[in-house]
Amino acid sequence: MLKIGSHVSMSGKKMLLAASEEAVSYGATTFMIYTGAPQNTRRKPIEELNIEAGRKHMEEHGIKEIIVHAPYIINIGNTTKPETFQLGVDFLRMEIERTEALGVAKQIVLHPGAHVGAGADAGIAQIIKGLNEVLTPEQTVNIALETMAGKGTECGRSFEEIARIIDGVTYNEKLSVCFDTCHTHDAGYDIANDFDGVLNEFDKIVGIDRLQVLHVNDSKNVRGAAKDRHENIGFGHIGYKALHDIVHHPQLEHIPKILETPYVGEEKKDKKPPYKFEIEMLKNGTFDEGLLEKIKGQ
């Protein structure tokens, strides 16, 4: 069975149940959540996440595994502000606890961090230091380091940088990788024309066994643009065929594939989620040029 889904919202009173219901409405077989708002540290207590009802709903609809995304305010690559680094370390520890409490997620996706001007070497050393403070041999979930586009001072823009972080971490059996198609394309890898070659390179440098999550996004920009602007499937510079082939790649069969493509619509209030339509299109093997209009009309 194809493990495919999207980012969904865990909110209101229903929390995990709401997330599962949204995912099922898209025809998804997995999904990704933030355990609270991605831009702040406010979090509901674990007992208010409605875990039991959410897990029951997932079970009834054949969803066995989900992904958690760490909030993007975490920056353990920061060497200039000790308080930012410490906030990241403390918050990541909390996210591990919350994810373990959910009991249905094995991976927490993390943007490795940004060096904010200190240089990539200093940033990578700081990320290693942070992960060494966070990871324990007892934890039951992994931190999945996301491949980054190289925007600004991001670390993790190349497979070599990801490998350096992993190699420096003591309990690195608790580390995996989230491969983002838009980011990797924007970082300069030719996944549109030679995904097998890119995957081979990843295997040599990082090891394919580390690849445990796939973020499936098209890109608004040309290869190597270092921009990180996601586009709807088939409407960007990677293209439908390449993304379809990646989603159905035999070496990645067991890995959850998560769409983070933009909502569609002119005005903010009119924007509609594309996921039901994109999931169906990736399953059926045919690109639909009229997809965006269908999404708007739902």
UniProtKB/Swiss-Prot annotation:
CDD domains: AP2Ec (cd00019). Zn(2+) 2 binds at residues 146, 180, 215, 260. The gene is nfo. GO terms for biological process: base-excision repair. SUPFAM superfamilies: Xylose isomerase-like. Gene3D superfamilies: Divalent-metal-dependent TIM barrel enzymes. Belongs to the AP endonuclease 2 family. HAMAP family: Nfo. GO terms for molecular function: deoxyribonuclease IV (phage-T4-induced) activity; DNA binding; DNA-(apurinic or apyrimidinic site) endonuclease activity; phosphoric diester hydrolase activity; zinc ion binding. PANTHER family: APURINIC-APYRIMIDINIC ENDONUCLEASE (PTHR21445:SF0), ENDONUCLEASE IV ENDODEOXYRIBONUCLEASE IV (PTHR21445). Endonuclease IV plays a role in DNA repair. It cleaves phosphodiester bonds at apurinic or apyrimidinic (AP) sites, generating a 3'-hydroxyl group and a 5'-terminal sugar phosphate. It comes from Bacillus cytotoxicus (strain DSM 22905 / CIP 110041 / 391-98 / NVH 391-98). This is Probable endonuclease 4.
